[in-house]
Amino acid sequence: PLDSYECHHGIGYSRFLSSKNGLKADLLAFVPVNSTCEINKLTLTNTTDAPKTFSLFSYAEFCLWNAVDDSTNFQRNLSIGEVEIEGSTIYHKTEYRERRRHYSFFSVNSPVDGFDTSRDVFLGMNNGNAFPAAVKENKAGNSVASGWYPIASHQINITLSAGESKDFIFILGYSENPQDQKFVAPNVIRKDGAHKIPVSYTHLR
């Protein structure tokens, strides 16, 4: 269990504070006005008098664009998941080539030490969200989903000096492209919209 936990909900935002073994986490979550994304700003603080080294894992599971169909049509859905990875951003592009012009993405403003896009690899077979295999082993699988359950997870290895804090900004976003401008190369989606969104929030403090 955590050593402490607080949850605050305000107008247009939620904030979650927790601590464990001298590590404090402060998560601010909100959806900006007139933007197709959710911002999660995480501040980690070492409250001890000694350096602390640990790994941070993010996690988001993508839907396949139709909630009812996602939960029923498994013989089809489990064969269509598709992703791209570019730096610290994971793109979900299921059915983008065939019949869609929109995609979603999950990014972080930091270099990553690993990633996963397959839920089975990240969680482990027949495992749940309580203790994912990647977290247990402290090692992401660098999996690239092809079908099954596409997710986005980043691994970031961190060392904080005594009293040091570090901010991470995670963005879960959505973007669309004109029908005739969907790709920049074979099987490489146009990412202009996704590239613009993080730039708008580099000022967050």
Predicted feature locations:
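An exposed, glycine/acidic-rich loop-and-rim segment of catalytic or binding clefts
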Residues: 55-91
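Short glycine/proline/serine/threonine-rich loop/turn segments at secondary-structure transition edges
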Residues: 178-180
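A short, sequence-level motif marking secondary-structure junctions
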Residues: 30-33, 97-98, 110-111, 174
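Acidic, contiguous internal or C-terminal segments within carbohydrate-active enzymes
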Residues: 20-64, 159
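Conserved small/polar residues in nucleotide/adenosyl-binding loops
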Residues: 202-203
